[in-house]
Curated annotation (Swiss-Prot):
Cross-referenced SUPFAM superfamilies: Thioesterase/thiol ester dehydrase-isomerase
Record NCBIfam families: unchar_dom_1
Pfam family, one: 4HBT
EC id: 3.1.2.-
Entry protein name: Putative esterase TV1331
Keywords: Hydrolase
Family to which this protein belongs: Belongs to the thioesterase PaaI family.
Molecular function GO labels: hydrolase activity
Upper lineage: Archaea, Methanobacteriati, Thermoplasmatota, Thermoplasmata, Thermoplasmatales
Length: 133
């Protein structure tokens, strides 16, 4: 399993994600939580967090939470759906990813996003194809 510095390194290898500042809150087998400061590069008109940024970060930690299991060396998104419940106008923003089910080649993941007032702002579900060593 990887740690917070590994997680930051994985984000740094991605053209978009490398612009995201975050701090790992915890990493466990099948679970990741990160805290993202609400900075200008994540805002859209109206001073709220851009929905595309919410989805990109959610998708990233969704897939990475599957990689916390032994033997999984990479993953790709098969499907990803997001429901936006309320705009995020206050940070920091907490992203919590949990693997609901994992098989030989597919993982099913849920990602919850909470705003700076700890209100549920979005819920995503993702399906990831797994590459094993």
């Amino acid at each position: 399993m990887f740690d917070g510095s590994d997680l930051k390194n994985l984000f740094s290898l991605d053209g978009f994600l490398k612009t995201i500042q975050f701090e790992p809150e915890y990493i466990r087998e099948g679970e990741i939580s990160i805290i993202v400061p609400l900075r200008n590069n994540l805002l859209r008109i109206g001073e709220i967090m851009n929905g595309g940024a919410v989805m990109a970060i959610s998708d990233a930690i969704g897939g990475l939470s599957a990689m916390t299991y032994p033997g999984i060396v990479n993953q790709v998104t098969v499907s990803f759906n997001t429901e936006f419940m309320r705009p995020i106008a206050k940070g920091p923003v907490r992203f919590i990813s949990r693997v609901d089910r994992i098989g030989k080649s597919i993982a099913y993941v849920e990602v919850l996003v909470y705003d700076g007032e700890n209100l549920l702002s979005s819920k995503s579900t993702g399906v990831y194809f797994l590459y094993r060593s």
